[in-house]
Structures are given as C-alpha cells and as structure tokens.
Amino acid sequence: PHNLDLLQWICGLPCRVRAFCHNGKWHQIEVEDDVTAYLEFPNGATGVFVTTTADAPGTNRFEITLERGKLVAEHDKLTFFELEQSERDFCFTATGGFEQPAGHEVTIELDGKNPQHVGVLNAFAGAILRGEPLVADGTEGIRGLELSNAMHLSSWTDQTVTLPIDEALFLEKLNEHRKASKVKTEVTEVTFDTSDSYGSKVSDNTDKGGVKA
C-alpha cells in the first residue's frame, strides 16, 4: 500500500478508477497479488498503477510525465529529463514526422536522508510530545485507503468507479468476500524475518543523489 500512499500524496486522488485485481493468482492466498489499474484525474491527467508479488527481481518505479519533461524515481535516485520547450508546443510546430523535442537529463541531488519507518515513528512521537509536524496526517491515510477501496470495488463490479466511492456498495461487496472466505486446513509454520524491511536508509554518497542501505 505504500506506493498508493505516495501516488495520491504527490498527484492527488483520481476521479475515476478502472482496476483489475487478481486474488491468489500466484500464491495460495485470498487477497490480490496481481493488480493493474487505470486512473483519471480531475485535471485530465491519466495514470497507470501496476503491482504484483510474482515479479523477480521486481520493479519499483514512479514516473510523472510533464509538458516540459519527465520525473523518474527509481533505484533510490530521482532523475529529471528536462525538455527545452513544451512538448505541446513542439507537437504542433515540428515539421518532421519523427522528431522529438531536445532536452537533457538531470540527476536531482538528494539530502541523503531516507528514515522511512523510523522517521515516521519519530515524527509521530514528536507530534505528541512537542507538537512537531507529522510526516503525513490521518487525512492522507484515509485518502490512500479510498484509492485502494476504489480499485477493489472496480474489480469486484467489473466497472469503472468514481471517487468518492459508494461506501454502502463497497461494504456489501466486501461482506460477500468475507462470507466466501475459507479457513486453510493445511498450515506450515515458518519463521519470517522482517528486519530488512523495517528501518531507515541513509546515504553515504549524497553528491550523486544515491541512497545506500
């Protein structure tokens, strides 16, 4: 869910969602493990969200295409490909059939700080003890949940849904899935180490914008 939080935090909530959520497609589970969603935003922008738990080595990429360039966050780096003129202006003035607007790539320098869970918890404690600002308040959590619920509802009904969603219909469909849930009869106990997924990342190479664990 973290990438959904980032998506709506940075881009805002979409107004329409069409999603395809596959439950137990790759694992013996009753929740989604393969999702593709198409998003439409109030300003006319569109987006695509794709995720799966069966992709190795996996992709963690956040891309925003703008009129004057493109932002890409991937491999702990933020890159901006800056165009010399607006793509919209170039589109209607270029005379060649396959020309592209000129531009150059810029690696955005980061501060090297990426505290992740530790930073969120420290900010939460600081807000209680000293009134310090949170990384994100409860409203952001509700918005991320709204987007997740919209994707589920779209997939369950096989329709495009508008936001805010019909909460009564969502609860109805959720309860249908609850009733259809089955208890696993064969369970294998395992020890699952989550230490590598919890903590913070601090760069020792801030001049290049890189972040190392």
Question: What are these language model-derived features?
Answer:
Residues 3-4, 117, 121-122, 148:
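A general structural signal for well-ordered alpha-helical segments in protein cores
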Residues 6-9, 123-127, 150:
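Residue-level signal for well-ordered alpha-helical scaffold segments within enzymatic catalytic domains
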Residues 34-36, 59-61, 68, 151, ...:
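Short, acidic/polar N-cap/turn motifs at the starts of alpha helices
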Residues 36, 41, 66-139, 161, ...:
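C-terminal glycine/acidic-rich active-site capping loop/insertion
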Residues 142-143:
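C-terminal structured "cap/appendage" subdomains that terminate the fold
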Residues 147-157:
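Short arginine-rich
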